[in-house]
């Protein structure tokens, strides 16, 4: 096992080879790898947050959406003052938004709560104010997921790569 230790790189090809070799019936696989961080937030209070994924993030063209996503939380729509359940974070050309999907449509609840630097992997949230969070780890933690630009991932500065059993 090459994960769970400092200074070791995640090799996508090794993972897919392991998957292919688990059973002769598996001829090929399409595996998606996401980086994630757990962000502990202050509920119902506006705070600034910063996370650094320390890897280049996927941004193949202007207008691409889907590099960043998150677990769900409750957020107040400042335009309507309505509390929205089931909100998530998303990105649009380096701007982080609060969005909500319903009936296949994505509604933007807040069009700018921070930035995402695709080159450095740095994410900042400004005056971010979730009311409650959908408990994944605990009642004040949001999981943030990003797609990397390359499939091999290098942990930098106190990062450890772990594959959790619940994600397999």
Report each predicted region and the residues it spans.
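Acidic, low-complexity glycine/serine/threonine-rich segments
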Residues: 1-48
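Acidic-enriched, low-complexity/disordered segments with a strong bias for Aspartate over Glutamate
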Residues: 7, 20-23, 85, 91-93, ...
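Generic serine detector
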Residues: 13, 54, 69-71, 90, ...
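Polar low-complexity, Ser/Thr/Gly/Ala/Asp/Asn-rich disordered segments used for subunit assembly
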Residues: 25-27, 36-84, 138-168
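Short, ordered beta-strand-loop transition motifs
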Residues: 41-43, 90-91, 115-120
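Structural flexibility/helix-modulation signal
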Residues: 67-107
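Surface-exposed interaction regions enriched in Ser/Thr/Asp/Glu
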Residues: 102-168
């Amino acid at each position: 096992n090459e994960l769970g230790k400092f200074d070791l790189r995640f090799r996508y090809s090794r993972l897919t080879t392991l998957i292919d070799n688990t059973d002769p019936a598996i001829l090929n696989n399409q595996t998606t790898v996401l980086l994630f961080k757990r962000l502990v937030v202050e509920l119902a209070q506006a705070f600034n947050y910063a996370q650094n994924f320390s890897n280049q993030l996927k941004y193949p063209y202007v207008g691409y959406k889907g590099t960043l996503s998150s677990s769900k939380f409750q957020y107040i729509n400042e335009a309507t003052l309505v509390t929205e359940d089931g909100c998530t974070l998303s990105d649009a050309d380096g701007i982080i938004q609060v969005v909500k999907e319903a009936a296949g449509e994505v509604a933007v609840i807040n069009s700018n709560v921070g930035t995402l630097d695709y080159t450095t992997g740095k994410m900042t949230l400004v005056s971010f104010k979730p009311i409650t969070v959908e408990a994944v780890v605990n009642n004040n933690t949001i999981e943030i997921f990003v797609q990397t630009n390359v499939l091999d991932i290098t942990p930098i500065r106190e990062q450890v790569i772990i594959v959790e059993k619940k994600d397999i």
